[in-house]
């Protein structure tokens, strides 16, 4: 992995107010970096949550605290003009109360008094086609639930030795979540 290019691309995404493209970054850098090189870098191999952990692990170790909080979130990157696929599809957006077309992704932040760092993520893939009985239309659904993704991310945080006191999540947890070597009881208010 080309860490300097990854850092540059991440900075570009964070600092941009509008649409971001490889061509846009190349233009911003006055063609000192070709858009083809950026595109090749982005399509080299799938970037996983484990890759993210390897990058942020040294930072987490510097700031880790027993009273840290894991904040899990569910977001949608809107892609209204892109063709539907396993990754890009229709998702219910709780902020607008409507279905929107885009990429649904789940994130986990490790938050201390000092900083918030991303430590895990999952992409919601609607990898199964089915026929809606009411409309007769072909639709897509995920074979792995968001709850299962959240549990996987939580287990990874425990396995990676991140100390934390609380977990904040946007979905209702199951009664018992097996995490690491023990079970953690969850309660709904």
Model regions and ranges:
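Conserved, well-structured functional cores that handle cations and Mg-NTP chemistry
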Residues: 1-188
């Amino acid at each position: 992995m080309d860490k300097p290019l990854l850092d540059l691309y991440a900075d570009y995404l964070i600092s941009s107010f509008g649409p971001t493209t490889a061509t846009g970054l190349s233009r911003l850098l006055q063609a000192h970096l070709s858009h083809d090189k950026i595109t090749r870098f982005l399509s080299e191999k799938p970037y996983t949550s484990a890759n993210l952990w390897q990058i942020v692990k040294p930072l987490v170790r510097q700031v880790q605290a027993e009273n840290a909080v894991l904040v899990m979130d569910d977001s949608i990157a809107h892609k209204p003009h892109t063709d539907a696929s396993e990754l890009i599809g229709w998702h219910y957006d709780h902020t607008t109360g409507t279905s929107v077309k885009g990429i649904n992704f789940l994130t986990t932040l490790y938050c201390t008094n000092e900083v918030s760092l991303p430590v895990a993520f999952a992409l919601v893939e609607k990898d199964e086609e089915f026929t809606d009985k009411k409309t007769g239309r072909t639709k897509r659904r995920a074979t792995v639930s968001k709850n299962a993704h959240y549990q996987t991310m939580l287990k990874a945080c425990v396995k990676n030795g991140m100390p934390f006191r609380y977990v904040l999540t946007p979905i209702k947890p199951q009664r018992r979540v097996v995490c690491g070597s023990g079970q953690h009881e969850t309660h709904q208010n």
